[in-house]
């Protein structure tokens, strides 16, 4: 890659990182509810009308205690609309007792150990030459990239999910709201 191309890529990445980082707010609103940095992931998520499906799934999978714990965690939180994109009946099937192992695997695939703000992810993307690999609590990986100023995650099956609200700071980590459910292998 010649110097001009390197500079163009660097400028595009820096613009994207700046736009993403600027989306961070003090006590942002998610799903019509203020998110407080003094509350944990579960305490905040239960108040978001956009995350009722996620909260129900977390409860069914027995992950409430974990996500109320000290962490820190980075959670890529799918909205109700993200779950609605799944084939009809998928959520109901996953919530059945015999499928809770699969549900837990999908949910923990949305969690990365540690607190990673958009700025932290942007640094990893820059250091990775335009891509960053994030290892999830489930054990799989997500690929993070910038696309026109937006942070996009690619899952193990090649599906993509865009961060729509970044840097929702919690007492035990950070939430990034995403528009599509990510799928592990």
Whereabouts are the PLM-identified features?
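Bacterial N-terminal signal peptides that target proteins for export
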Residues: 1-9
